[in-house]
Design a protein with these regions (language model features):
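ATP-dependent adenylation/nucleotidyltransferase module used to activate substrates
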Residues: 1-156, 181
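Histidine- and/or cysteine-centered catalytic micro-motif in compact active-site loops
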Residues: 147-149, 169-172
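A mobile, often basic/glycine-rich helix-loop segment
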Residues: 155-171
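Metal-dependent de-N-acetylase/amidase catalytic core
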Residues: 173-180
């Protein structure tokens, strides 16, 4: 059995914070970090690290329910706790319109959203489009919040959660993200 890697949380937090600072110095000294906030561990820890590195005024949390969102209140609370500006964009009308447009292309009573691969991955891709639209508007950089464990097992949809201008947690497995948080 492989030996469990022990991390020094303080060293890792300093390392990540310095990496974020350097990234923004080189790639957008006046830019904001645009991050999707789900209320989960990854977006919460990433947002906290961004605040530490850039200051809360340069971090924008975007909450994107698809109609309903089980962790909506938690996501709002995360933004409030960190003191970051938050924007809520309900993507339900976008996903519904996309499904309708695709279904209209078929001659039969097709229902594309009944395909689990579509109904799971499409909202993630739409969320990433929303983040990039907001980043363009605010001269921001989009944050990828995936961790190493998700990348390893292929949990994240291509052009969805995996997209971003930079990744804060990609070197850390779930256990390490929890320790850092």
């Amino acid at each position: 059995m492989a030996k469990r890697k022990i991390i020094d949380v303080n060293i890792e937090v300093d390392h990540i914070t310095n990496w974020i600072k350097n990234y923004f110095i080189k790639n957008g000294p006046n830019s904001k970090a645009i991050i999707g906030i789900s209320g989960g561990k990854d977006s919460t820890v990433a947002a906290a690290l961004l605040c530490r590195a850039l200051g809360k005024d340069r971090v924008v949390g975007v909450i994107m329910p698809d109609g309903t969102m089980s962790d909506f209140t938690i996501a709002k609370d995360v933004c409030g706790y960190l003191g970051i500006n938050s924007i809520v964009v309900d993507i339900n009308s976008i996903t519904s319109a996309l499904y309708r447009a695709i279904d209209d292309g078929y001659d039969d009573d097709h229902c594309i959203k009944n395909n689990p691969a579509v109904s799971t991955n499409t909202p993630a891709r739409i969320r990433m489009s929303v983040l990039y639209a907001l980043a363009a508007e605010m001269h921001g950089r989009v944050v990828n919040t995936c961790n190493k464990s998700e990348d390893y097992v292929g949990y994240s949809p291509k052009y969805g959660d995996l997209a971003g201008d930079f990744s804060v947690l990609s070197s850390y497995c779930v256990r390490e993200v929890k320790e850092i948080g």
